[in-house]
Amino acid sequence: MNIDMNRFISILQFLTRIPIKRDVPMEEAFHKGIIYFPVVGGIIGALLMVAYRGASLYLAHSLSALLTVGFFVFLTGGLHLDGLGDTFDGLYSNRNKETILEIMKDSRLGTNGVLAMVFILLLKLYGIQGLGEHQIYWGIILMPVMGRQAIVYGCYRTIYGRSQGLGHLFIGKVSKKELLISSLLTFILAAMHLPSLIFALLLPIGSQLYKGHVMKKIDGMTGDTLGSLCELTEGCYLLFILLITGAGLF
């Protein structure tokens, strides 16, 4: 098996619970596999679309949307959702940098974290419910693509905010070439749905604004803040599609 395929499988195993019975060694250049983040997002989205389509054949639209969101959490192991909760607990605790990082590291979930997680899950649920017949399939497929590409932007030209953790695998290690490749893959996937392509073009700006906000708080990015960026991007993506289509622009 060549290096690129090894990296792709490693990233697929890292970001999902998809059972792949293959041992792939963690290489020193594991971070180079970040170019596959949007591709893995597309795989997740395709599986979500199949799940939604299957459920909608027998169940009401609202229940199908609920099961799709639940399957999304299961498929990813709640990896980024957990980061969202930890980030909101820490960043908005009104403490200093060291205390914020300690709070984010704590496995216990606080009020801010619970509220953030509930809000984003409800936003996804009602976002999927609100998508029209011509938007829902692309919306479901491309939502995970946008979230994972946002992580790539979040890792570029920044520093790691703590001494250890999963975030060190990617943060500050993304080259301009890797950024361009992953962005191109995202644009190719989004090109099949014009509202999504517009969102993809705006995504670097939004990601940079988020990154700047986090950097002011803790002087860097962490795995938790990347997870939060992913979840917030997915929610904003659905909201953007609803707003732009609701305005009759597409």
Curated annotation (Swiss-Prot):
Pathway: Cofactor biosynthesis; adenosylcobalamin biosynthesis; adenosylcobalamin from cob(II)yrinate a,c-diamide: step 7/7. One of its GO terms (biological process) is cobalamin biosynthetic process. It is found in: Cell membrane. Keywords: Cell membrane, Cobalamin biosynthesis, Magnesium, Membrane, Transferase, Transmembrane, Transmembrane helix. Belongs to the CobS family. Its cofactor is Mg(2+). It is a multi-pass membrane protein. Joins adenosylcobinamide-GDP and alpha-ribazole to generate adenosylcobalamin (Ado-cobalamin). Also synthesizes adenosylcobalamin 5'-phosphate from adenosylcobinamide-GDP and alpha-ribazole 5'-phosphate. Its EC number is 2.7.8.26. This is Adenosylcobinamide-GDP ribazoletransferase. The chain crosses the membrane at residues 32-52, 59-79, 113-133, 136-156, 185-205, 230-250. InterPro entries: CobS (IPR003805). HAMAP family: CobS. GO terms for molecular function: adenosylcobinamide-GDP ribazoletransferase activity; cobalamin 5'-phosphate synthase activity. It holds the Pfam family CobS. It comes from the Bacteria. It catalyses: alpha-ribazole + adenosylcob(III)inamide-GDP = adenosylcob(III)alamin + GMP + H(+); alpha-ribazole 5'-phosphate + adenosylcob(III)inamide-GDP = adenosylcob(III)alamin 5'-phosphate + GMP + H(+). It is an enzyme of class 2 (transferase). One of its GO terms (cellular component) is plasma membrane.
